[in-house]
Structure formats: structure tokens, C-alpha cells
């Protein structure tokens, strides 16, 4: 065989636009061999031969070879070096964060100095309506099923897709309806978590120290419940796990734990000697005619042992009908409420582990990304367990 044999350098003509973009009649990113649109939608990006485009070798033209070799097609979203840097940072964070006083404020890093525009997800990564309308009509479902096996889709969706591939047609309708759900919710998860961090009406408490102004206990408990519900919705979503959702969920959970920590610093347990003093400040003063005067919320101020500035927490009175709880019963009630919410957070951490740390659900077995997810889970679990122990210590009865 001569050196000029065309088989030695087999070159074919491929179109500049991938098959999915050409079929949907949208502009292709031309980031060959993987276009950004196909990466965002989780589709197999392929280029059919065409006589009206430039030449590319077969190795660059077929992304399936990269997938077989284990190369993840997610370099457009986050490179391996950036993920490794974040993973290394969180590993050092776990070794240094022995107490809440040394806890790096991940919330401040994400939200400080950012305008509302910067908190909005990048438009380049949004799933547009024109892309959504063409999902159900995309062909080559068998190749999509190969990628579907990598991610944790519900069994109902997987069985419906299998019915389409086998030609049964039983799951065709349900597959067409449900296929848009993960793609729609992928960006909604990030937007909801960012919104939960950026809401101005939420308590501005930080795990670095004390709040700048007094906070209302009712506002803290209400905000923690709503924020925890937002994270629960994100964890139950069937979208593909990604770094952004994991980091945002970690920031939200750390903020909730910081709220509970401030409440614990301002609440005295049933064994504290200062409980009677706080009860004197918080109990309503009866009027001369025997009726309770208008209840004004009181402010409990505790000075931390390390000499830092005092933190204030507004403790509204708690009543059961005409009966008002005294200081000891009120703070015991607060402790049980916090334990109940922390129990929900414990179940949420199990969902976080299944979504991000399970070997079968981690993105294509990327080691750097797996280390990042494990570091985030360890950080949240350590802070969660420390908070649970503090609450139980407050509720101990000698």
C-alpha cells in the first residue's frame, strides 16, 4: 500500500452546524466536536457528512469515541482545573473550620458585592423555548439512552424511553411530556437557590459572628422553613447534577445553620442561671385593672465569651390561648422546633448524598468533581451535627 493511499488519511466533509441544531433550525455554537447547546441539553452531538463545510478528521468529528474513552463533555461549563481548585479549597476549609468562629462565610462570597444582574444565571446557559419545543421530535433516541444510563433518572422515565426504543410505543406519550421536565428545572433550580440567597427580607445573619442589627425570632424560623423547602425542591429535581447547584445548596444550608447558631447564642437553656433574668425582661407587666397591657417584644442581649460585640434577638411572646409561656417553656419550645427542622435537614442531606455523592450519579466518574461533592457533603454534615448537639445540650434536664 503506497504512502499516498487515501485510506491512511481518511478525511470527510462535515457540516459546520451539528445535526440537532440544523434540525431545529437554530444557530450552532460551532464549538466542535461538542457544541454548547447539545452539552446544555444533554444530547449526543453529531455532525453528518456534507459537501458545504470544512474538513475535519474522524476523531474530531465523532464525539462517541471521546465518550467511550471516558472524556467528559462538560469542559464548556467548568474545566477540570477549576473544579480541582474548588475541591482543594473546600478540603482545606474542612481542616480549618473547627468552630463557627472560623467558618468561612460561603454566603458572603456568593452574594457580597453582587448586583441583581450578576445574580441572574448567564443567558448563555439558559434553555430557550425554541430548544424546548424540539426535544420531543429529536431522533436518534438510542444514542440518547446511552447517556441516560449515566444519570439518575426516575425508573418511570427510563422505562418510557425504553418502550420507545423497543418500538412498543407505550411510553411515547409520557416520554414526550416528561422529557422537558429535567431541562426546564435545571436552570430553575439554580435560579431558585440564588433567589433564596439574595432575598433582602431574609435575616442577614452570618456564621462569621454576630448580626449587625437585632433579628426577630419569628422571621428567622419562617425564613429557615421557606429556604429549606427551596433546597428540598432542588434536591428532588431530576435534572443532571452540576457544580452550581451543589455549591448553591451548600451555601443555603450553611446560612440556615448560621441562623440556628445565632438563636442558640441568644437562648438560655432550662439549666442556665440567667433564665429568670430573661423571664423578667420578657414577661408582660399586668396593669392596675388586672388586664395585660399591650405586649411589646423584648430584646435579649448576650455577650459572647470571646469578648465580641453582643448580639440581639427579638423574642416575641408565645401564648396558648390565654396562657403565656414563661421563659423556660418558651426556650424549650424553640429548641424542639429547631430539632424538628434539623431533622428535616438531615433527611435533605441524605438526598444531597444520593444526588451528588453516589458513584452512579456522579458526572461520568470525574474524580475532581466527586471530591468537590464529597467535601461539600462533609462540610454540611459536620456543621449540622454540631448544631444538633448544641440544641440537645440546651434541652438537657439535670
Swiss-Prot record:
Swiss-Prot/TrEMBL keywords: DNA-binding, Metal-binding, Nucleus, Transcription, Transcription regulation, Zinc
Family matches, as Pfam families: AflR, Zn_clus
GO molecular function, one term: DNA-binding transcription factor activity, RNA polymerase II-specific
Chain spans, region Disordered: 52-73, 275-314
UniProt cross-references to InterPro entries, sorted A to Z: AflR, Zn2-C6_fun-type_DNA-bd_sf, Zn2Cys6_DnaBD
Biased composition (Basic and acidic residues): 56-67, 289-298
Induction statement: Expression correlates with aurofusarin production and is restricted to vegetative mycelia. Expression is negatively regulated by the MAPK-mediated osmotic stress-signaling pathway.
Biased composition (Polar residues): 299-311
Biological role stated in the UniProt entry: Transcription factor that specifically regulates the expression of the gene cluster that mediates the biosynthesis of aurofusarin, a red mycelium pigment which is acting as a mycotoxin.
Name this protein carries in UniProt: Aurofusarin biosynthesis regulatory protein aurR1
Organism of derivation: Gibberella zeae (strain ATCC MYA-4620 / CBS 123657 / FGSC 9075 / NRRL 31084 / PH-1) (Wheat head blight fungus)
Gene: aurR1
Amino acid at each position: 500500500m503506497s504512502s499516498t493511499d487515501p485510506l491512511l488519511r481518511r478525511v470527510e466533509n462535515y457540516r459546520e452546524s451539528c445535526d440537532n441544531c440544523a434540525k431545529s433550525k437554530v444557530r450552532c455554537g460551532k464549538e466542535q466536536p461538542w457544541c454548547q447547546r447539545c452539552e446544555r441539553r444533554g444530547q449526543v452531538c453529531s455532525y453528518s457528512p456534507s459537501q458545504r463545510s470544512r474538513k475535519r478528521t474522524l476523531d474530531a468529528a465523532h464525539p462517541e469515541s471521546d465518550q467511550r474513552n471516558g472524556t467528559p463533555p462538560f469542559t464548556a461549563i467548568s474545566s477540570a482545573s477549576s473544579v480541582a481548585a474548588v475541591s482543594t479549597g473546600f478540603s482545606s476549609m474542612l481542616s480549618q473550620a473547627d468552630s463557627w468562629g472560623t467558618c468561612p462565610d460561603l454566603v458572603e462570597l456568593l452574594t457580597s458585592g453582587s448586583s441583581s444582574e450578576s445574580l441572574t444565571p448567564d443567558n448563555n446557559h439558559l434553555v430557550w423555548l425554541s430548544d424546548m419545543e424540539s426535544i420531543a421530535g429529536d431522533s436518534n433516541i438510542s444514542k440518547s439512552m446511552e447517556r441516560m444510563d449515566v444519570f439518575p433518572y426516575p425508573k418511570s422515565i427510563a422505562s418510557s424511553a425504553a418502550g420507545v426504543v423497543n418500538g412498543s410505543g407505550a411510553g411515547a406519550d409520557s416520554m414526550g411530556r416528561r422529557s422537558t421536565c429535567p431541562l426546564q428545572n435545571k436552570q430553575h433550580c439554580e435560579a431558585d437557590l440564588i433567589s433564596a440567597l439574595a432575598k433582602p427580607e431574609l435575616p442577614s445573619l452570618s456564621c462569621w459572628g454576630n448580626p449587625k442589627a437585632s433579628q426577630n425570632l419569628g422571621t428567622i424560623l419562617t425564613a429557615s422553613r421557606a429556604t429549606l423547602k427551596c433546597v428540598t425542591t432542588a434536591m428532588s429535581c431530576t435534572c443532571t447534577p452540576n457544580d452550581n447547584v451543589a455549591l448553591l445548596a451548600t451555601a443555603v444550608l450553611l446560612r440556615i445553620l448560621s441562623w440556628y447558631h445565632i438563636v442558640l447564642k441568644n437562648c438560655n437553656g432550662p439549666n442556665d442561671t440567667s433564665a429568670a433574668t430573661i423571664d423578667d425582661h420578657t414577661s408582660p407587666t399586668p396593669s392596675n385593672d388586672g388586664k395585660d397591657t399591650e405586649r411589646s417584644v423584648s430584646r435579649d442581649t448576650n455577650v459572647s465569651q470571646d469578648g465580641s460585640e453582643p448580639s440581639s434577638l427579638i423574642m416575641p411572646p408565645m401564648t396558648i390561648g390565654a396562657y403565656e409561656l414563661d421563659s423556660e417553656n418558651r426556650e424549650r419550645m424553640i429548641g424542639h422546633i429547631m430539632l424538628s427542622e434539623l431533622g428535616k435537614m438531615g433527611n435533605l442531606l441524605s438526598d444531597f448524598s444520593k444526588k451528588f455523592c453516589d458513584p452512579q450519579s456522579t458526572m461520568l466518574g470525574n474524580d475532581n468533581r466527586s471530591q468537590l461533592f464529597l467535601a461539600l457533603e462533609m462540610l454540611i454534615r459536620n456543621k449540622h451535627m454540631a448544631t444538633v448537639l448544641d440544641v440537645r445540650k440546651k434541652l438537657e434536664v439535670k
